[in-house]
Every structure is written in C-alpha cells, then in structure tokens.
Amino acid sequence: MLEIKTLEKADERRDFPRGHLEAVHLSGLDFAVATFEPGWRWTESVAPIAGTESCQIHHHCYVVQGRMRIRMDDGAESEVGPGDVFVCSPGHDAWVVGDEQTVVYDFAGPMATGYAKAD
C-alpha cells in the first residue's frame, strides 16, 4: 500500500484564537501541523474549546520554527525550539515565546483528530 496526501489540501482545518491546525488522515497515521501566533497560550486560546483546565492531548512533535514553553500540571517546565523533537503527556499548558510564529508537526493521532475541536 502507498498512500500520499498533501497539506496543501488538508482533510480539515481548525481555527482557534491566535492559531490554526491543519490535519491529514491516512491509514494508520493522523498528522497535524499546528501554527501558533505570538501571544498564543493554550489556556487562553484552546481551553475554552476543550473545556478542560489543561491540555489533555498526548503529543509527539517536531518544532519547525519558533519557540514554545511547556508547563506540566506537576510544575515541570521546559522550552522547545527549531529542530527539537519532543513527547508531551496529557496535562500541560503551553505558550509561544517571543514574537515569532511557532509551527509544530505532531505525529500523535489525538492532535489531528481532537485538538481544538468543539464537540
């Protein structure tokens, strides 16, 4: 089997305050590209849509551009930037650092299937 899709014709796009997500769905892979503008913060932009106090999505990500700070519910905190690959468990907040747009590729299905999606 060979299956190919392009983000130029994403299966879906979700807009949220100060950002958006584009997703493609393939057999065995749901892939998302999230774009966050300066000033974006999960608790302000997505929490009202998700209805939770912190992000409950599991992420497997690669940062294409920009910087983002992530704070876990247990207080652990770190910053990611271009070229970083990271895994982030449910239960976190995140925000753009600086005045550059942040672009993240997420290979974990839940981001592509449920992130910033109203019920």
Q: At which residue positions do the language-model features occur?
A:
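Short beta-strand segments
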Residues: 32, 76-78, 103
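Glycine- and acidic-residue-biased ligand/ion/polar-headgroup-sensing regions
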Residues: 29, 48-74
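Double-stranded beta-helix
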Residues: 3-9, 14, 95-119
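Conserved short histidine dyad/triad with adjacent acidic residue
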Residues: 33-54
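A short, N-terminal "cap"/entry segment at the start of jelly-roll beta-barrel domains
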Residues: 1-35, 43, 119
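Short beta-strand segments in beta-sandwich/barrel cores
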Residues: 41-42, 66-71, 94
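Short acidic-glycine-tyrosine-enriched beta hairpin
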Residues: 72-92
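Conserved GNAT-family N-acetyltransferase fold
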Residues: 34-36, 61, 86
